[in-house]
């Protein structure tokens, strides 16, 4: 049968295995740039961040030319403004897929992730603003027997 234990000292102690919070370190490539990918809807953006004068380039164009609507320009600049780093980084992005709104969101997501790779201290500010979270909303698929994803065909009684 099992041996009886007379006291807790005989049982011994369990080693504490506290999982320490992950330490975020600076991740740079050979040219001193931080790289990240951002996604939104069907758009995928590849973003490089390096210290500079604040120039933002999207697909080899100035971002004001690529995203003509002011709303899209504002979306793109949100993580930079939230982290008070305007005019400190040059950002180069290549984005493909989706429409302009999805592409702007993808570049914003990529900029946020690249900024945290370059400067890990910004992570709390950007996470609180919701810039590091991938927006998982995508278009709902069309179903057969329906006009669109949910809209039914017009019904006629007679």
From Swiss-Prot:
Annotated GO CC locations: cytosolic small ribosomal subunit
One annotated GO molecular function: structural constituent of ribosome
Keywords per UniProt: Ribonucleoprotein, Ribosomal protein
A biological process from GO: translation
Coiled-coil regions listed: none
HAMAP family: Ribosomal_uS9_B (MF_00532_B)
Family listed: Belongs to the universal ribosomal protein uS9 family.
The protein, known as: Small ribosomal subunit protein uS9
Organism: Brucella abortus (strain 2308)
Lineage, uppermost ranks: Bacteria, Pseudomonadati, Pseudomonadota, Alphaproteobacteria, Hyphomicrobiales
Designated gene of the protein: rpsI
């Amino acid at each position: 049968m099992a041996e009886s234990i007379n006291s807790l000292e005989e049982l011994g102690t369990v080693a504490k295995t506290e999982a320490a919070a992950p330490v975020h370190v600076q991740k740079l490539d050979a040219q001193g740039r931080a790289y990240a990918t951002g996604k939104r809807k069907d758009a995928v953006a590849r973003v490089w961040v390096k210290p500079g004068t604040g120039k933002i380039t999207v697909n080899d164009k100035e971002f004001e030319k690529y995203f003509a609507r002011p709303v899209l320009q504002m979306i793109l600049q949100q993580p930079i403004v939230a982290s008070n780093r305007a005019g400190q980084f040059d950002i180069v992005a290549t984005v493909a897929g989706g429409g302009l709104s999805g592409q702007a969101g993808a570049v914003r997501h990529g900029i946020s992730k690249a900024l945290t790779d370059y400067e890990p201290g910004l992570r709390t500010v950007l996470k609180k603003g919701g810039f590091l979270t991938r927006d998982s909303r995508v278009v709902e698929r069309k179903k057969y027997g329906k006009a669109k994803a949910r809209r039914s065909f017009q019904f006629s009684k007679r």
